[in-house]
Amino acid sequence: MRKVVFLLMLMTSLMAMAGDSLSVEPAPVSKKGSWLKRVIDAFSDQDTLYVEPQHYNWALMLQSVTTYDYYRLSTTGPNGQSISFSPQLDVRFGPYFGWRWVFLGYTVDLRNLNIFNKSPKFELDASIYSARFGADLFFRRTVNDYKIRSAYMGPDINTRNLEGAAFDGLKVSITGVNLYYIFNYRHFSYPAAFAQSSCQKISCGTWMAGLGYLNNHIDFDYERMEALTKEHLGQEVKLDSGFRFNSVKYRNISASVGYAYNWVFARNWLFCSSLSMAIGYKKSYSEDEKSINSGFDFSNFNIDGIGRFGIVWNNTKWYAGASAIVRAYNYHKSRFAANNIFGDFNIYVGLNFGPRGPYKKKRTL
């Protein structure tokens, strides 16, 4: 199986383009085009007492990416049941190359290096980390690659033999975009923790607020699940009526608020922790693409969340570290619920080179 990941990371485009003005006297600028520079400066203005801007134009990085995905399907009521699924962990490795705000990478699945095998998974992640704004775009599709991690079929049914069984009746496709605004952008740097394009020099925190959109599609073969249950448990188990569906689609619009903190615990070292909670309104759709419930319903509100954690050593030229992004989405109806947790864990080491004009003769931190 081949696992190819294309990562487009727009590393602080606004800050990188205007970084020179943060630590040197601004040169006279002609009126022509000066409005663009003022706009860029407005979006990337940071206090260099707190944040050291990028010194280089080019970057080279090696990164390992471990992907985690967990799904829990459950029903409610006196005959409530639950099944938890997750695929085998993916570990991918590859090089990345960047110029200022463009970062491109190519990774392969270390579990199977046969480049001619087709993977049942496809993942695309893109992130923008700028001084004032941030954005995430992600698409994930997993087809028949899940294993049962736990199951509850009733008080008198021992489901231990189901644990670890491969299940080829679950297909999941999820597409989403998140946009957020960083309030204390002059003193706090998200790129320092997750894009390695600046350095946080003094510990600092900030509140954030954002908007998000999510489109989720779940295909579930309940007949295959009943057959697998009989095969592994040696008895026929009837799935609850809430599980007897073939497809569920829902769209989610959310508003989020969160807090992030950059802790500079030693010279050139940084630890970042960020948590955001979102209130999302989800509208589900039936298999014939018609809305199940076209009217407003308070029960369609759910709580979602996203966490970002990172530790990095960066002296502006060399850097190394690890980061994790975890997302949690919840969908609840009167008889059925789906909970999804997925994320990436990254370990990387890299080099910046090609000093920018103002830093060609400057020593690193």
Cite the ranges covered by each PLM segment.
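Residues on the lipid-exposed face of transmembrane beta-strands in outer-membrane beta-barrel proteins
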Residues: 62, 93-99, 124-128, 177-183, ...
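Outer-envelope beta-barrel architecture signal
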Residues: 54-60, 91, 100-102, 131-135, ...
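Surface-exposed strand-loop-strand hairpins of Gram-negative outer-membrane beta-barrel proteins
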Residues: 67-92, 103-117
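Extracellular/periplasm-exposed beta-strand and loop segments of Gram-negative cell-envelope proteins
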Residues: 84-92, 146-152, 161-174, 218-230, ...
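Outer-membrane beta-barrel "beta-signal"
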Residues: 176-179, 341-365
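Transmembrane beta-strands of outer-membrane beta-barrel pores
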Residues: 64-70, 99-103, 108-112, 130-132, ...
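Short loop/turn motifs that connect adjacent beta-strands in outer-membrane beta-barrel proteins
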Residues: 31, 35-39, 43-56, 184-205, ...
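Outer-membrane beta-barrel translocator domains and adjoining extracellular loop/strand segments
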Residues: 71-79, 116-121, 148-154, 190-194, ...
